[in-house]
Amino acid sequence: MSEKHIDEFSGVETTGHEWDGIRELNNPMPRWWVWTFYATIVWALGYAIAYPAIPMITDATKGMLGFSSRAELQQNLDQAKASQTTLHDLIAAKTVHEIDSDSALREFAIAGGASAFKVNCATCHGSGASGGPGFPNLNDDDWLWGGDLDAIQATIAHGIRFDGDTDTHASEMPPFAEVLDPLQTRQVAAYVWGLTNTPSDPGLAEAGKQVFVDNCAACHGDDAKGKAEMGAPDLADAIWLKARGEDAIIRQVAAPKHGVMPAWAGRLGDTTVKELTIFVHSLGGGT
């Protein structure tokens, strides 16, 4: 048995440990700390009795209060859903113009539309709606089918070139490889690129103007500004959906690529489509 050691200065027993002649006094813990520790033990026992706490083989103790975190969550969800019912009903009953003019409804619709956008639209258009190659940027003011509320709603509801919806936007640029010879294709590509950039060959671009007037102006307009009613893009704004440069234009003229957007009305319902419309319009590019 080790010999007890009493500190000669304080008269307090030491722990028996020594480091380079330094000994640790074995003072008792403060009484307030001890009673606090005992209180936490009592509180823990009371909690284990009152609430679900002790895991069993297939379940856990229920607790005397019958509390359930799942039931509490469901109650909170039901309360939140009930508080939103009135606003959802108003959105369902009003037009997108009426919703947009009501600040409270507009704010609620934007929040709902932002949530629906992340789940259904961000895969193609990006989480920030900035798009990518082949997928339009929804933040700018370049709209193939129009950027006002009615046009955006129609596009979301019925999609673009979507076979399952008879009201879908349906326009396709024909393949001009069967109409134009390779030289004419290079000429019109140089002309279109030259509308916003420096063409590789000014002579080709000059000759391409007449090729454009004869073959492209019917859809894109004499000024190449496009026509929303036909889904024909503006070629004079330096915004390119698929790729940039004369080579990319040559490929698109010869064998066009056409994107498809699903019709969302049948999947999401009219109310969510309206919320998406308000949200997309609020991004800054809506007209």
From Swiss-Prot:
Gene name of this polypeptide: fixPc
Binding site for heme c 1: C121, C124, H125, M261
Biological role: C-type cytochrome. Part of the cbb3-type cytochrome c oxidase complex. FixP subunit is required for transferring electrons from donor cytochrome c via its heme groups to FixO subunit. From there, electrons are shuttled to the catalytic binuclear center of FixN subunit where oxygen reduction takes place. The complex also functions as a proton pump.
Pathway noted in the entry: Energy metabolism; oxidative phosphorylation
Protein name: Cbb3-type cytochrome c oxidase subunit FixPc
Annotated Gene Ontology cellular component terms: plasma membrane
InterPro entries (alphabetical): CcoP_N (IPR032858), CcoP_N_sf (IPR038414), Cyt_c-like_dom (IPR009056), Cyt_c-like_dom_sf (IPR036909), Cyt_C_IC (IPR008168), Cyt_c_oxidase_cbb3_su3 (IPR004678), Cytochrome_c_Oxidase_Subunit (IPR050597)
Transmembrane parts of this sequence: 37-57
Source superkingdom: Bacteria
